[in-house]
Every structure is written in C-alpha cells, then in structure tokens.
Swiss-Prot record:
A motif (Nudix box) lies at residues 52-73. One of its GO terms (molecular function) is hydrolase activity, acting on acid anhydrides, in phosphorus-containing anhydrides. InterPro entries: NUDIX_hydrolase-like_dom_sf, NUDIX_hydrolase_dom, NUDT19. This is Putative nudix hydrolase 7.
Amino acid sequence: MCIGKVTSSWRSAASIILACKTTRRVLMLKRGTTAKFMPNTMVFPGGVVDKTDAKLGDEFRIAAVRELFEESGVLSTKNGWQTSANNPDMTSLKADIVNDTSKFEQLSGTICADNLIEWDTFITPANYPRRFLTKFYLMLVDDEPAIDLCTSEMSEYNWIEPKECVDEAYAGKYALPPPQVYELTRLSQVKDWDLCEKYGNVKKPICPQPIKTIGENLITNCFPGDYMYIDENSLQQPLRQMSADRVTVDPTQPTHRATYYSEPMYGKVRLYQHLLKPADIAAFHQFDTHSKDLL
C-alpha cells in the first residue's frame, strides 16, 4: 500500500568526504539543532549548489570545494590544501563567502576541484518534502588539516575512522543517516585509499524507495537492484507500507537496501547487499554488509 505525497523535483547538492590516508580517518561534522535538513545528525561537509558555482567549473565539484571551505575552513588548492584555522585573512574571507557565495570567485586562481574523486550520487526519497540530488566526492589528504568550524551551521566536528563512526552510530551515540553509513562502510573496506577511484559508484544514482513496516517504526530503503525496487518511474515512488513478513530480508533474492528505525532517528542502520544481477554488480561497488549474517 502506498501512502503520502510525492515531491517530484529536487535541488542539486554536493558533499565531500575529506579522508586522511595516513591516519585513515575522515572528517565528520554534526549539524546544528536549527538545520533545515537532517538536524542533529553526523554528516560530511556539503550543501546546495549555488548558481555562481558554474562560473568556476563543474558546478557540483566547485560546490563541494566551496562547502568544505565554508563549513570546515579547509580549502582544496592546486598545491594540496590550505586551512583558515589560525589565519585571520582566510577566516575573514570564509565569513564573507558564507554570507555571499559569489565572493568565492576571489579564490578562482587558487582552488582545485580536479583532484576530487567522484564517489557516489544519492537522490532523496520521493516522500521527503525537501529533495536533493547529491553528488558525493572523496578528497584524499596526507595529513589532517586543522579545522575552523562554521558554528552557525555545525555544532562540532570529529576526525574518526569510518568503521568506528558507523559502530558508534549503531550503538546510539549519535544519528548517522543511511547514505553516510553506506559511504563510510564502503570506504572502510578499501584497503588502499590511493585506489579509491576504481570503487566509485558513477554509473547509476541511488534513489532509495522507502517501505514502512506496519505496526513498527522500522523503515526499509530499497536501492537499485533490490528485488523490491520499482524500476518504472523509480525516482518518484511514494512511501509504501507492508507487513513485516513481506519486507523481511530474503537471503535468496537479489538485495540492495538499508534498514533503520525512525525512533531514535536513523537508529541501528543495517546494510544488505547480496545476489545482485550482473548489471547491478557492475554498477555498484560490492562490499561486505549485514548480508553475511544471513548467508
């Protein structure tokens, strides 16, 4: 049974996973309580593409670089990176850019977006009132830059190993949205981060199709390739409701999904990926998930 309305349009957005090869840790930010989208959740730096971003290059890549600078003070440059931490001039410019994104053009001769690795694309489920098509990029660095946090948008930051972040969220320490769990789990299983480019999901976006379990606060997000994923009009599917026996993970069927509890927010996210068809195996990075507990 389908319930609720569908939001047919979305805005373009970009997110960046800042990953240190030496420590194998990534930068995570916690959204503030007043954030319009996913408040009080741990996320990667990122935000909406601005109309001025296209003036400097690929609008998604430029937006990723700009948002990283706005939220963390870390700037991707042609020589690696710079940080506004303990740099009054850069701190002042960062504040100006937060208030007026067009001022990012002042850094056009300094910034570099070509070094970003295209990692994945997620589209917000159709039942959400605010939808985004978000391109995720990976930026690899040799050392962890000092962070100059934008406290008007974020409440805290943390350098943390990907698996540790996922485990702490599962234990209830903080809320971690399913896309972040998906990307961190993938990244944690890449042994050599210098080879990350070969694991990017660049062929097909992931638009989760949510199913609510009747009588429970359990949500199932079906991804492309899952046997319950609806391919026709796949980006505009409304929320469905099903009994527990219908939506329970089947170890004998092609499966690509995330499950979580809506209370507490994004509680105990579990990923499943098994028995995908060849075309979906080619389209999506294959990695270990909770499916190993079933097979």
